[in-house]
Structures are given as C-alpha cells and as structure tokens.
Curated annotation (Swiss-Prot):
InterPro entries: SmpB, SsrA-bd_prot, SsrA-bd_prot_CS. It comes from the Bacteria. This is SsrA-binding protein. Disulfide bonds: none annotated. Belongs to the SmpB family. It comes from Mannheimia succiniciproducens (strain KCTC 0769BP / MBEL55E). The gene is smpB. GO terms for cellular component: cytosol. GO terms for molecular function: RNA binding. The keyword Cytoplasm applies. GO terms for biological process: trans-translation. Pfam families: SmpB (PF01668). Keywords: Cytoplasm, RNA-binding.
Amino acid sequence: MTKKKVKPGSNTIALNKRARHDYFIEEELEAGLSLQGWEVKSMRAGKANISDSYIIFRDGEAYLFGATIQPLTVASTHVVCDPTRTRKLLLNQRELASLFGKANRDGYTIVALSLYWKNAWAKIKIGLAKGKQQHDKRNDIKDREWKMQKERIMKNANRG
C-alpha cells in the first residue's frame, strides 16, 4: 500500500491569541468537538473564530461557549445554521472530573486556545487559566520588547 500524501498547509483553523495575553495558562488539554456537517465544511473553509470562547460545565459535561462558526453561503436551506451554538466537548470522565475540580478554584477558568485538524478530526486545545492583572500584562510586553531589542543588538554586532 502507498503512504498517504501529506497535504501542504497548516492544520490550524483558528487561534485565540488574546487568551495568552489575558491569562496565565497553567495546563493544556486536547478535546474533540461534537459538530454538525455544515460546521465541518465551514471550518474547512476557515470560517471559525474562538477569540471570545470559553468552556462551561453543565450536567457533568463540558461545552464550548462563545465560539463562532459562520455558515457557508452555499449551505443547505433545510438546515437551520446557528453560528454561536454551544458545542459539546468530547472528553473522558477522568479528564472531565479533573478539569471541573481545577476550574472551581477561585480565579480559574477554562479557555479555548486553538482549533485545529488532527488527521480528519477537528480538535480544540483548551487551557486551565488564571487571569492576569494589568501589571502582569505590562511586564510581559516589556519582556517581549527587550527580547526583540537584544536580538536586534546581537544581529548588528555579528555583522561587524
């Protein structure tokens, strides 16, 4: 049998850049998503946004809340497309119990970090997060700028 051809391009569908800016991410976890057919097609077209999304617990299950998947214009007319519906996360019971216990601590929440393809399945990376204060955000910006400045200095010094 021949090997599968690797398709060029990125497997990432959507990133939540604000999550790493607004939160300290303490633990990351991969989860599957329960999706409808039109959502998969839209995600393949890159019409997903998880920038304001977070995870809620209801009846012992985890749900993705606030994610937006825009339907394609050529979508079926007999299916009602709700772009902002809550989507169930596919996690095993041990992972659910662990996340639920950790998220119930004071100041912790669970946010969506990235949405991507793994083989043919849509996966979401979620993170246990603690909110940053304003001074923490400023320190991160200062550190990032200093790092870029150091690299610039080293580059110019190496040129001679």
